[in-house]
Amino acid sequence: MAHRFPALTPEQKKELSEIAQRIVANGKGILAADESVGTMGNRLQRIKVENTEENRRQFRELLFSVDNSISQSIGGVILFHETLYQKDSQGNLFRNVLKEKGIVVGIKLDQGGAPLAGTNKETTIQGLDGLSERCAQYKKDGVDFGKWRAVLRIADQCPSSLAIQENANALARYASICQQNGLVPIVEPEVLPDGDHDLEHCQYVSEKVLAAVYKALNDHHVYLEGTLLKPNMVTAGHACTKKYTPEQVAMATVTALHRTVPAAVPGICFLSGGMSEEDATLNLNAINRCPLPRPWKLSFSYGRALQASALAAWGGKAANKKATQEAFMKRAMANCQAAQGQYVHTGSSGAAATQSLFTASYTY
């Protein structure tokens, strides 16, 4: 039976589907450069660089001004509001620099967490008020996709059914509003890696969360072909004493996705969740070699796992431009190969690439 009140026109659906497919075509993934001022400050502090708007702009200019060949591995970049309106040293808006490289521009749309009363420190996400107006303005300003991060954690009686349902509905409402305004919604339900839970526990919780999210997306008439999913990989908690291989992570992850994510979704772009750069690449490669049906493109949407080596190479010094850009390009290409199951670990990664990037209760 045809839906009596269609949410989108055929033209809107076509545009959304084409944008989503462009982002994940041929092993391409997403650079998440949407860190808030505070989060970026924590990163700069580690390399002893002051957290000023100019220093944030300079580092992002290094990432965005790399050789045009970056478009072979990066299909989209998520920006923070500040960055969307910043310019490079020649006076060109960053968003135009990216578009000229054939990269799709995205924006962070959620406004952080708010406590869910009556739960064990669980949260829901703020930002739905005024979202339609913000999306409309961002579309005019050249943005083609959005991102909304909901956070769930594994702990005593967590995640509760209330937290799962509340966050699933917020994600679905956001996705619907995005699509009405011509933006592809990246749906990000993150099960945090904090805790000592094992792989099986994370898989169980991830399946419950994803099932609720896709039920909510269906209830809200979201056009799945015009969305992307940004989930956590299924991993053991950071404090778990048992260690798992990339192949075990891959099997648990693809099994969870296979049970919950419709084949209509064009791409699944994993978050790195505080893994080292190298671990994030190895796990993604194993996922794309997993001997289970994989009807979606399985790619990456990494922040720390694409930037850590580059940030360490930069150190706040303009003279380190070449080394910074080479470090970023190397990680981007490695993840593009992993998104096609073709990455070969050479063992020649620098210290920054193998260092854990985990931060407890991580917030953007």
Curated annotation (Swiss-Prot):
Modified residues (Phosphothreonine): T39, T119
Positions where N6-succinyllysine occurs in the chain: K13, K121, K317
EC number: 4.1.2.13
Top-level EC class: lyase
Record: residues binding beta-D-fructose 1,6-bisphosphate: R43, S272, G273, G274, R304
Subcellular compartments: Cytoplasm, Cytosol; Cytoplasm, Cytoskeleton, Microtubule organizing center, Centrosome, Centriolar satellite
Main localization, broad class: cytoplasm
PROSITE patterns assigned to the protein according to its UniProt record, in alphabetical order: ALDOLASE_CLASS_I (PS00158)
Residues with PTM N-acetylalanine: A2
Reactions catalysed, as given in the entry: beta-D-fructose 1,6-bisphosphate = D-glyceraldehyde 3-phosphate + dihydroxyacetone phosphate; beta-D-fructose 1-phosphate = D-glyceraldehyde + dihydroxyacetone phosphate
Domain of life: Eukaryota
Site, as annotated: Necessary for preference for fructose 1,6-bisphosphate over fructose 1-phosphate: Y364
Protein keywords: Acetylation, Cytoplasm, Cytoskeleton, Glycolysis, Lyase, Phosphoprotein, Schiff base
One of the GO BP terms on file: glycolytic process through fructose-6-phosphate
Protein function: Catalyzes the aldol cleavage of fructose 1,6-biphosphate to form two triosephosphates dihydroxyacetone phosphate and D-glyceraldehyde 3-phosphate in glycolysis as well as the reverse stereospecific aldol addition reaction in gluconeogenesis. In fructolysis, metabolizes fructose 1-phosphate derived from the phosphorylation of dietary fructose by fructokinase into dihydroxyacetone phosphate and D-glyceraldehyde.
Other comments on record: In vertebrates, 3 forms of this ubiquitous glycolytic enzyme are found, aldolase A in muscle, aldolase B in liver and aldolase C in brain.
Quaternary structure, from the entry: Homotetramer. Interacts with BBS1, BBS2, BBS4 and BBS7. Forms a ternary complex with G6PD and TP53; this interaction is direct.
Protein name: Fructose-bisphosphate aldolase B
Source organism (scientific name): Mus musculus
